[in-house]
C-alpha cells in the first residue's frame, strides 16, 4: 500500500483537488482585498439595493465637480 505522500502525488497528477487546503492566489484576505470604507459601502448596498444607483450618481457628480474645478 503506497504511503500518504505517494497517494497525494498521484492525486495531484490526475488533477483532482488536493485534500490539503491550498490558498487561492486570486482570493487575498479581506484586509488586503478592500478598505474598511469599501466594506462599509458594500454592507450598505447589500442592505438597500436601491441605494447603489444613488451612490454611483453621487460619485459621478462629485467627479464632474472635481474635473470642472481644475
From Swiss-Prot:
This is Prokaryotic ubiquitin-like protein UBact. There is a cross-link at residue 70 (Isoglutamyl lysine isopeptide (Glu-Lys) (interchain with K-? in acceptor proteins)). HAMAP family: UBact. InterPro entries: UBact (IPR037543). Residues 1-70 are annotated as: Disordered. GO terms for molecular function: protein tag activity. Keywords: Isopeptide bond, Ubl conjugation pathway. It comes from Terrybacteria sp. (strain RIFCSPHIGHO2_01_FULL_58_15). May function as a protein modifier covalently attached to lysine residues of substrate proteins. This may serve to target the modified proteins for degradation by proteasomes.
